[in-house]
Amino acid sequence: MLGWALTFLVVAIIAGVLGFGGIASGAASIAKIIFFIFLALLVISLVVNALKGRGPKV
């Protein structure tokens, strides 16, 4: 799950850069929403893994 959260976080960051750069100004609000959703999923995933006692896979 952490892998998916990181993947979608990267996709959201790329969409945000394109949206805020003027290339796709209509997608900026969608990129903001996606970014914060997957940022929250990343934090939740890190907390759950920490509580289970497992460290991140390297």
From Swiss-Prot:
User: Transmembrane ranges?
Assistant: 4-24, 28-48
Tell me if Cell membrane is a UniProt keyword of this record: yes
Reading the lineage from the top rank, the first entry is Bacteria
Q: Where in the cell is it found?
A: Cell membrane
Annotated InterPro entries: DUF1328
Q: Which UniProt keywords apply?
A: Cell membrane, Membrane, Transmembrane, Transmembrane helix
> Per UniProt, what is the membrane topology?
Multi-pass membrane protein
Primary location: membrane
Q: Name one GO cellular component term.
A: plasma membrane
Similarity comment text for this entry: Belongs to the UPF0391 family.
UniProt-listed HAMAP family: UPF0391
Protein name from the UniProt record: UPF0391 membrane protein ABO_0024
Q: Which organism is it from?
A: Alcanivorax borkumensis (strain ATCC 700651 / DSM 11573 / NCIMB 13689 / SK2)
